Structures are given as C-alpha cells and as structure tokens.
Amino acid sequence: MNKAEDLWNILTWLGVENRPFYRFRSTYCVMGGYGGYKVVGHKNLESLNAELNTVMLRRKKDEVLDLPPKIHSTEYVELTKKQQIMYRDIKNGIIADLENILTSVNPLSCTLRLRQLTGGLFTEENPKLERLMDMLSEENIPNGYKALIFSQWEKITEVYYEALKEYNPAYIVGKVSPEDREAEKERFQNDPECKLAIGTIGAMGTGFTLTKASYVFFIDKAWVSGDNAQAEDRAHRIGTEDTVNVISLVAKGTIDEGIEEYLIENQDLFDRVVDGKGSKHDIRQVLNNLLKI
C-alpha cells in the first residue's frame, strides 16, 4: 500500500476518517492525466502523517530486521554519436519552447523523450543494454545469481525483455494481469532457470517479494526517490540472504545525471515541481539543472 488514497478504507474503518472518499482524495492527491482522473502525485502530506500518527506506531526496517547490506553504485555509459545528435535536437526544442513549458500543467513531461532516448528507445544502438549484458555476465548471473531490472516505461522493458531471453526472464508490467504477475513472481523465486525479473517501477516495484535477486539494475529512475527505494527493496526484505547490489545505469552528460543529483541532494525542490506546487522559478531551476542549460 503506497498511495494516499489506499489509506481511506483503513482510516475509515478505524474511525479516524469521516470524510467521503472523493474529499479525502482531493485533499491528499494531485490529479492529472486524461480527464484528470489519474493520481499523479500527493499533497498535504504533513496533515496526512499527523492523522496516521494517531493510529500507527512506525519502526524503520533497519531497526527491526537483521538484513544483509545493500550497496549502491552507478555505472556510466556514453551515448553513441547518433544518440548524441538526437539528444541535442530534442534538448534544443525544449529550450526553444521553455517559456511555454514553464506555465504548462506538467512541465517535466517535456523531458520524456530525452529520458527514453538514454534508455534505448528510438535507435537500434543501446549502450545501456550493451553494458548491462556485460555486467550480467561479469556478475555470474548464469551461475546462480539473479537480478531485477527496472524501468519507468513498458516500451523500454520490452526492449530488454526481448534482448535478454537467454536468461528466461519473468516479466511484470502494467498490462500483465494480476494472476500472471503473481505467477511470474513465483517463477522468479522458485525456478533456477529464471535468472531475471524485468518490469516497470510502477508494476514490479511494489507488492512483491523478490528476495532471490542479489542485483537490482535501474535503466532509469522514477522522479520520486521513495518509489525507487520501494522498487529496490523488493530484493531487500525478510528472506534476503545475500548482499543486494543496486546499480543505476546513467548516460554521461545527460538528464540521467541531473536526476541522480536531485534524488540525492535536492529532493524537496524536485518534489514541489513533480507535485505541481513549484513556482515558475522552481521549475526553471529544475529544468536548467536537468538539461544543463
């Protein structure tokens, strides 16, 4: 349970929430997407936390569980010449339209094609995939270890799924039914021939125990650090026996580097812009840093 709207039933049952669902959701959820029916972010979280604190005793995982360590590292790749040209053209288009973007409903959506380009869409050349394949071999994935591979987008997961079929991967994305997702999870956990689980951060990043994985690879990251932490913790929970190595694939000199920096150093500013609360100055600052303008 990772969305504010999911708490309404529990809080109502406990007797601490008396508002109808639609009012609860409008208080704590940022709506967007087609028709404004999709939850795209959260707001008023201090108020929600205050409500939760009346009925919840929180303990951090590292305070109550004796788990193996989790090690984070970054693996850098270089875009190909063709990708660099495409990246520059897309970036220049964003810069040319920047004043309109600053006042748009979802300003960060302008970076979508840049992010997908670094992940391997739009060209046959894919440095991240090539490096990942080398690393899978180097890390002895064929000899007993298993790995999770995450992306934000189904289109990118499809590319990696097709390229890595030799590892008999499980596949968990939004279009896969709940029953089949569960079957894929069981296959990854119990079938020694299933070496990889490939999925989206949204679908595979919550609600699953995937403790057979010793490695977690991010092709790209979610805007919200908590979503990435949830995803990597599919492998780092009760039942984990080995050290979990979390590896982020980052294209040098691109928006990938900017996102990594914000997730580590300035999540508050990032969150304001993602949640639609950022000022025009905030949005400009974030885009300038992401695009290295």
Predicted regions and their residues:
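Conserved nucleotide-binding/hydrolysis micro-motifs of P-loop NTPases
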Residues: M1-K3, C29, K81-Q84, E154-I156, ...
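Conserved helicase ATPase core of P-loop NTP-dependent helicases/translocases
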Residues: L148-F150, E158, E166-M204
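Coupling/hinge elements of helicase-like and P-loop NTPase modules
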Residues: F21, R58-I71, L102-T103, R272-H281
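A conserved SF2-helicase RecA2
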Residues: W223-I293
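Conserved P-loop NTPase motor "coupling/switch" region that bridges the ATPase
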Residues: M1-E63, T240-T243
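SF2 helicase motor core recognition
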Residues: N2-A4, I156-Y161, E182, K195-D220, ...
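Conserved helicase/translocase motor-coupling segment
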Residues: V64-K165
